[in-house]
Amino acid sequence: QQHEGVLINISSGAAWKPYSGWGAYCASKAAVERLTQVIAQEEESIGLRAHSVAPGVIDTDMQALIRATSADRFPDVSRFVDLKRRNDFNSPRFVADALLDLAFDPSQRTSEVALRLPDESS
Protein backbone atom coordinates (compact mmCIF):
# COMPACT_ATOMS: atom_id res chain seq x y z
CA GLN A 1 0.00 0.00 0.00
CA GLN A 2 1.48 3.33 -1.10
CA HIS A 3 1.33 6.34 1.20
CA GLU A 4 2.99 9.70 1.17
CA GLY A 5 4.70 11.40 4.05
CA VAL A 6 7.71 13.39 5.10
CA LEU A 7 10.02 13.14 8.08
CA ILE A 8 12.25 16.12 8.82
CA ASN A 9 14.94 15.74 11.46
CA ILE A 10 16.99 18.73 12.59
CA SER A 11 20.70 18.26 12.15
CA SER A 12 23.58 20.70 12.51
CA GLY A 13 26.84 21.65 10.90
CA ALA A 14 28.29 20.11 14.07
CA ALA A 15 27.48 16.73 12.51
CA TRP A 16 30.33 17.36 10.04
CA LYS A 17 32.58 19.83 11.87
CA PRO A 18 33.92 18.81 15.26
CA TYR A 19 33.88 21.42 18.01
CA SER A 20 35.99 20.98 21.13
CA GLY A 21 33.72 20.66 24.15
CA TRP A 22 30.74 19.57 22.04
CA GLY A 23 31.48 15.85 21.76
CA ALA A 24 28.00 14.65 22.71
CA TYR A 25 26.27 17.30 20.58
CA CYS A 26 28.40 16.58 17.51
CA ALA A 27 27.97 12.82 17.91
CA SER A 28 24.20 13.07 18.38
CA LYS A 29 23.79 15.24 15.28
CA ALA A 30 25.95 12.83 13.25
CA ALA A 31 23.68 10.04 14.51
CA VAL A 32 20.63 12.01 13.36
CA GLU A 33 22.21 12.25 9.91
CA ARG A 34 22.84 8.50 9.67
CA LEU A 35 19.47 7.51 11.14
CA THR A 36 17.68 9.73 8.63
CA GLN A 37 19.65 8.17 5.76
CA VAL A 38 18.66 4.69 6.92
CA ILE A 39 14.99 5.67 7.31
CA ALA A 40 15.00 7.25 3.84
CA GLN A 41 16.37 4.04 2.36
CA GLU A 42 14.09 1.70 4.31
CA GLU A 43 10.86 3.64 3.86
CA GLU A 44 11.20 5.00 0.32
CA SER A 45 9.06 2.16 -1.04
CA ILE A 46 6.05 3.30 0.99
CA GLY A 47 6.39 6.91 -0.10
CA LEU A 48 8.12 8.45 2.91
CA ARG A 49 10.59 11.23 2.21
CA ALA A 50 13.11 11.58 5.01
CA HIS A 51 15.37 14.60 5.37
CA SER A 52 17.89 15.82 7.89
CA VAL A 53 18.16 19.59 7.74
CA ALA A 54 21.06 21.62 9.08
CA PRO A 55 19.39 25.00 9.59
CA GLY A 56 22.52 27.08 10.00
CA VAL A 57 23.20 29.23 13.03
CA ILE A 58 19.86 30.40 14.42
CA ASP A 59 19.38 33.35 16.74
CA THR A 60 18.10 31.43 19.78
CA ASP A 61 18.64 31.17 23.53
CA MET A 62 21.08 28.33 22.81
CA GLN A 63 23.29 30.82 20.96
CA ALA A 64 23.24 33.18 23.95
CA LEU A 65 24.45 30.30 26.15
CA ILE A 66 27.18 29.45 23.66
CA ARG A 67 28.43 33.05 23.58
CA ALA A 68 28.46 33.16 27.39
CA THR A 69 30.77 30.14 27.56
CA SER A 70 34.40 30.83 28.41
CA ALA A 71 37.06 30.23 25.76
CA ASP A 72 38.79 27.66 27.98
CA ARG A 73 35.59 25.55 27.97
CA PHE A 74 34.71 26.25 24.32
CA PRO A 75 37.68 27.32 22.18
CA ASP A 76 35.46 28.32 19.22
CA VAL A 77 33.36 30.80 21.21
CA SER A 78 34.81 33.78 19.32
CA ARG A 79 33.25 32.52 16.08
CA PHE A 80 29.79 32.73 17.61
CA VAL A 81 30.48 36.08 19.27
CA ASP A 82 31.52 37.41 15.85
CA LEU A 83 28.33 36.05 14.27
CA LYS A 84 26.29 37.95 16.85
CA ARG A 85 28.28 41.14 16.35
CA ARG A 86 27.58 40.92 12.59
CA ASN A 87 23.99 39.77 13.21
CA ASP A 88 24.78 36.90 10.86
CA PHE A 89 22.14 34.42 12.01
CA ASN A 90 19.16 32.74 10.44
CA SER A 91 15.95 33.79 12.13
CA PRO A 92 13.68 31.12 13.61
CA ARG A 93 10.97 32.33 11.18
CA PHE A 94 13.23 31.85 8.14
CA VAL A 95 14.04 28.30 9.25
CA ALA A 96 10.40 27.46 10.04
CA ASP A 97 9.27 28.72 6.63
CA ALA A 98 11.95 26.66 4.87
CA LEU A 99 10.93 23.53 6.79
CA LEU A 100 7.25 24.09 6.00
CA ASP A 101 8.10 24.55 2.32
CA LEU A 102 10.11 21.33 2.33
CA ALA A 103 7.23 19.46 3.93
CA PHE A 104 4.28 20.88 2.01
CA ASP A 105 5.32 22.74 -1.16
CA PRO A 106 5.53 20.30 -4.10
CA SER A 107 8.00 22.59 -5.89
CA GLN A 108 10.44 22.17 -2.97
CA ARG A 109 10.44 18.36 -3.01
CA THR A 110 13.81 16.74 -3.36
CA SER A 111 15.26 13.27 -3.13
CA GLU A 112 18.27 14.62 -1.25
CA VAL A 113 18.35 13.37 2.32
CA ALA A 114 20.92 15.66 3.98
CA LEU A 115 20.12 19.32 3.40
CA ARG A 116 21.72 22.53 4.57
CA LEU A 117 19.70 25.71 4.63
CA PRO A 118 21.37 28.72 3.04
CA ASP A 119 22.17 31.78 5.08
CA GLU A 120 19.13 34.01 5.32
CA SER A 121 21.20 36.97 4.15
CA SER A 122 22.10 35.26 0.86
What residue spans do the PLM features occupy?
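Active-site loop immediately N-terminal to the catalytic Tyr-X3-Lys motif
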Residues: 17-23
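Residue(s) in the substrate-gating loop at a strand-loop-helix junction
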Residues: 12
